[in-house]
Amino acid sequence: MGEDKGNGDGGKLLYCSFCGKSQHEVRKLIAGPSVYVCDECVELCNDIIREEIKEISPKQDQDKLPTPHELRAHLDDYVIGQDKAKKVLAVAVYNHYKRLRNATPKDGVELGKSNILLIGPTGSGKTLLAETLARVLDVPFTMADATTLTEAGYVGEDVENIIQKLLQKCDYDVEKAQRGIVYIDEIDKISRKSDNPSITRDVSGEGVQQALLKLIEGTIAAVPPQGGRKHPQQEFLQVDTSKILFICGGAFAGLEKVIEQRAHVGTGIGFGAEVKGEADKKSISDTLLQVEPEDLVKFGLIPEFIGRLPVLATLSELDDEALIQILSEPKNAITKQFAALFEMENVELEFRDDALKAIALKAQTRKTGARGLRSIVEGILLDIMYDLPSTDDVAKVVIDESVVKGESSPILIYANSEAQTASAE
């Protein structure tokens, strides 16, 4: 079918060797040695190959499930501290994917899903832990902000939009999406506004918890490929959320007070009361380790919602030493990232130990945890990153404590080994 035929004008009309369409019926005709293929056939071949890859990839994944020890080791490469939380996450994630790979019940025993609740202050590593797990397992990952969610029918995002975002991450491959991880941040912000059910609708608090119940537990969610409430005529995708791992995280500010009230430590009055001294006071992190489901109910989460998150992990507040480690030790440490940026300019970047301590202290003062470290380093390096591309012969930039405190400019060491201090403009 690839032979040339006259087109009546004295020229030759070319035809696709596969489908027989002429060059005028297709957008593009690609020529080979005595053979032609049109763009439509190329696209069809790509679709066939993609479908075969989809069928093969789940089988290949069977042999790639890391053990809890291996998962923990990967987390250690990117996340400093939080040993207890890492252990809890490694076991929960391993069991979840083991359940998916052995979907057929044995002896009638059907394995339930164990979603995860992470409790810890801002910047303690909740999001990073979830992201790292998804990257290690090579599964689709998406994040949702609980504060933007509302009940269906109200202004805001429907909970089904979470699944739609997950589908977007894997090019609307339903099978792949059903092996994904969803991280819902700020989950504490959808707590019930009062202990007693209100006669008015709480569309962004308890209402969202109710809407999330079925999604987290497992349901067949009908999701439009284009998302949202538009395009009502289009065909919906059916996604089984019982196979998706949901990780919810929040700072739960004030939860420690609820726990202390339950513990009744040093709360009595009178001559026989136990008085709580300074030495008996626990840190917020230590108090959160004692959290019970009843404390979360008191905080404002409904019992049914807590029941869908059986695995609980608490993250401790990061101290100065941990922040210093985060700055320099992980594979993608902030100082290593900026050193790589400077290396592109053929310049070495050095942070002295006293500079790292000063940066950690500044982050502690701001109470932003590890999340605030990048913005601090960005601010310190702003002027030098602005000037460096226009400066010749700089071989090394040194950052010390005085630079972090704003008392001096970075030390520039030139290629001729003569050290100078960059003069402030």
Curated annotation (Swiss-Prot):
SUPFAM superfamilies: Glucocorticoid receptor-like (DNA-binding domain), P-loop containing nucleoside triphosphate hydrolases. The keyword Zinc applies. GO terms for cellular component: HslUV protease complex. InterPro entries: AAA+_ATPase, ATP-dep_Clp_protease_ClpX, ATPase_AAA_core, Clp_ATPase_C, Clp_protease_ATP-bd_su_ClpX, ClpX_bact, P-loop_NTPase, Znf_CppX_C4. GO terms for molecular function: ATP binding; ATP hydrolysis activity; ATP-dependent protein folding chaperone; protein dimerization activity; unfolded protein binding; zinc ion binding. Keywords: ATP-binding, Chaperone, Metal-binding, Nucleotide-binding, Zinc. ATP binds at residues 121-128. The keyword Nucleotide-binding applies. GO terms for biological process: cell division; proteolysis involved in protein catabolic process. It comes from the Bacteria. Zn(2+) binds at residues 16, 19, 38, 41. Residues 4-57 form the ClpX-type ZB domain. ATP-dependent specificity component of the Clp protease. It directs the protease to specific substrates. Can perform chaperone functions in the absence of ClpP. Component of the ClpX-ClpP complex. Forms a hexameric ring that, in the presence of ATP, binds to fourteen ClpP subunits assembled into a disk-like structure with a central cavity, resembling the structure of eukaryotic proteasomes. Belongs to the ClpX chaperone family. This is ATP-dependent Clp protease ATP-binding subunit ClpX. It comes from Shewanella halifaxensis (strain HAW-EB4).
